[in-house]
Amino acid sequence: MGEYGKRAEQLFMEGYNCSQAVLLSYSDITGLDDKTAAMLASGFGGGMGRMREVCGAVSGMFIVLGIVAGYSDPSDAQGKKSTYAAIQELASRFRKENGSIICKELLGLSKPEGTYIPAE
């Protein structure tokens, strides 16, 4: 695990959700202050608001990529294309390493929605 992964793990153990931990660990690259980063990523934890859908760590990676290499001009078709390609590549690499980008699959959970606690 690299420096950013170790930092994200430490932040997660301090109580931040997966998305917050990833985004906060890249603050030197994103330029976001901790409060802004934590608030921005707060709803993505637990696989999107504890719905156990897209993994919060994956969402955090996508936010970092968007800040670093995303597009802002809605008419920038090439920027959109390259951003989406980069997101798809990140997702593919994460799937290969972890088997899925879906929170409940990563955690092996099968409980009904809304019954999870963060420690699970």
Q: Where are the predicted features?
A:
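Transmembrane alpha-helix interface/packing and boundary motifs in multi-pass membrane proteins
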Residues: F44-R52
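FAD-binding core of FAD-dependent oxidoreductases
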Residues: R52-F62
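DPxDG-like acidic metal-binding loop motif
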Residues: G60-G70
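Short helix-coil transition sites and intra-membrane helix breaks within transmembrane domains
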Residues: E14-Y16, M51-E53
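Polybasic, low-complexity association/targeting segments
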Residues: M1-E14
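Short helix-capping/linker segments at secondary-structure and domain boundaries
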Residues: I29-L32, V68-D73
